């Protein structure tokens, strides 16, 4: 064992060897030294544990190469670009919606330069940051007023805290959803100070259930759109229009949490059934909350639209300061909303909308192109084919609806890594590629791949299929 320890190169020798790597040589010397020291300490631990037993395992050329890979991995940014080949458009774990070029440029400009964030250029006095998006939200949704906070859970919380703190909010038992990250509507309500008053059964709720539950303690009626699951079979749900009529008759505000938030009617794509924000406002909701970074295709934000008197009260809530959005988000959101003034252009240039509405013919063409690139790149190690498949919208929207697509399937030939092994290698690639496996094949969905990513996908796969070195 002592002889093995003597074979380890000194730190300075490794640093000299790594100096030939342009990428590593650009790192701060102290950072590089710390990373090399950590690597050599790991080798010492492996010797003590009996995991390294042969002198050949400590050949200096091998050690230098392994160290270079480990140092590169240890010093690269943790927050990284990922290639999404899953076909899930609004992938909540991979960053949700991609921004349109105009929105990304607006956010970058807001970062790099001063702006009129809270400055009224007409008067030269202090202004409101919300003024940049209020008018366009009014125009797009038909609402009297609007406010934006940092996400939809915050939007729901500040609405309830403002309108119902210490009082009851009536909601159907079948709408007490979990919104992700183990956060549930009842818990959000409890934090807001509102008192939950459940009515109806999980599968059936009638208008009379709401009306019978109203008391002097009632502050509001809440409808939560169950966008991330469906109850089917023997069911009954009160429509928003019915609830709005009841609220108006009893003098109670009606709040609708739309969750994903949709400004586009996707019926032409075979995705009917999701209410739009415009419909919710038209049907009489007093306050509507929804997300900015899901089906809407913008940055993370919680958007609140509705009657002016309620929005004014919410705007004055001190929580608004804690939940306010930053200048980059505002810039990106305004740019995204401005694109919606021309619905056809919005569908073409907002990536989320473009991916959802992509035609089966266009996807089949893209799949054939990708398959051709992969046949060349993988040199017979995998059988590559284009097969029918399904994509998902994601982001808690359209849980029962698949989008028809053409998948590229990779099935291993003799000696090639299995689909599961290849998938793991792709996660360690640079950039990482996320795909699915099914029926003994690795599946790539072109729906969530940009045209300029196809060659990169082929390159990443070719590198991932190389024999692993020690």
Swiss-Prot record:
Primary localization: cytoplasm
Gene3D superfamilies for the chain: 3.90.1150.180, Type I PLP-dependent aspartate aminotransferase-like (Major domain) (3.40.640.10)
EC number, UniProt record: 2.9.1.1
Cofactor dependency: pyridoxal 5'-phosphate
Broad enzyme group: transferase
Keyword Transferase: yes
Key words, A-Z: Cytoplasm, Protein biosynthesis, Pyridoxal phosphate, Selenium, Transferase
Biological-process GO terms, alphabetical: conversion of seryl-tRNAsec to selenocys-tRNAsec; selenocysteine incorporation
GO molecular function ontology, one term from the record: L-seryl-tRNA(Sec) selenium transferase activity
Matching HAMAP family: SelA
Recorded family membership: Belongs to the SelA family.
Record PANTHER family: L-SERYL-TRNA(SEC) SELENIUM TRANSFERASE
Name of the protein in question: L-seryl-tRNA(Sec) selenium transferase
UniProt gene name: selA
């Amino acid at each position: 064992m002592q002889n093995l320890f003597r074979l380890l190169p000194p730190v300075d020798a490794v640093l000299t060897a790594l100096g030939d790597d342009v990428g590593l040589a650009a790192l701060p010397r102290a950072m590089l030294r710390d990373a090399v020291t950590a690597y050599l300490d790991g080798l010492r631990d492996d010797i003590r544990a009996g995991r390294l037993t042969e002198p050949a395992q400590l050949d200096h050329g091998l050690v230098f190469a392994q160290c270079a890979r480990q140092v590169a991995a240890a010093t690269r940014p943790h927050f990284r670009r990922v290639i999404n080949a899953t076909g899930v458009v609004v992938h909540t774990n991979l960053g949700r919606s991609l921004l349109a070029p105009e929105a990304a440029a607006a956010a970058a400009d807001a970062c790099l330069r001063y702006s009129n964030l809270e400055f009224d250029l007409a008067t030269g006095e202090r202004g409101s940051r919300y003024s940049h998006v209020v008018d366009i939200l009014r125009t797009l949704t038909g609402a009297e007023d609007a406010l934006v906070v940092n996400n939809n859970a915050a939007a729901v919380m500040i609405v309830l805290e403002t309108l119902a703190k210490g009082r009851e909010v009536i909601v159907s038992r079948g709408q007490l959803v979990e919104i992700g990250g183990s956060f549930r509507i009842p818990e959000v309500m409890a934090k807001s100070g509102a008192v939950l008053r459940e009515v109806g059964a999980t599968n059936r709720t009638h208008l009379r259930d709401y009306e019978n539950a109203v008391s002097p303690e009632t502050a509001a009626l809440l409808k939560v759109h169950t966008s991330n699951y469906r109850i089917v079979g023997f069911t009954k749900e009160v429509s928003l229009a019915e609830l709005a009529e009841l609220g108006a008759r009893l003098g109670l505000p009606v709040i609708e949490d739309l969750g994903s938030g949709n400004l586009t009617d996707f019926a032409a794509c075979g995705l009917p059934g999701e209410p739009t924000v415009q419909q919710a406002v038209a049907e009489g909701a007093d306050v509507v909350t929804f997300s900015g970074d899901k089906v809407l295709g913008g940055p993370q934000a919680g958007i609140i639209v509705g009657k002016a008197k309620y929005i004014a009260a919410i705007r004055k809530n001190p929580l608004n300061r804690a939940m306010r959005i930053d200048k980059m988000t505002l810039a990106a959101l305004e740019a995204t909303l401005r694109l919606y003034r021309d619905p056809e252009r919005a569908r073409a240039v907002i990536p989320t909308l473009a991916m959802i509405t992509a035609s089966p013919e266009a996807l089949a063409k893209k799949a054939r192109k990708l398959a051709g690139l992969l046949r060349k790149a993988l040199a017979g190690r995998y059988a590559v084919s284009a097969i029918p498949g399904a994509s998902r919208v994601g982001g808690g929207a359209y849980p029962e609806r698949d989008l028809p697509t053409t998948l590229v399937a990779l099935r291993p030939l003799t000696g090639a890594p299995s689909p599961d092994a290849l998938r793991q290698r792709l996660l360690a690639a640079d950039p990482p590629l996320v795909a699915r496996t099914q029926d003994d094949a690795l599946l790539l969905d072109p729906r969530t791949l940009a045209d300029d990513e196809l060659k990169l996908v082929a390159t990443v796969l070719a590198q991932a299929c190389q024999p692993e070195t020690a």
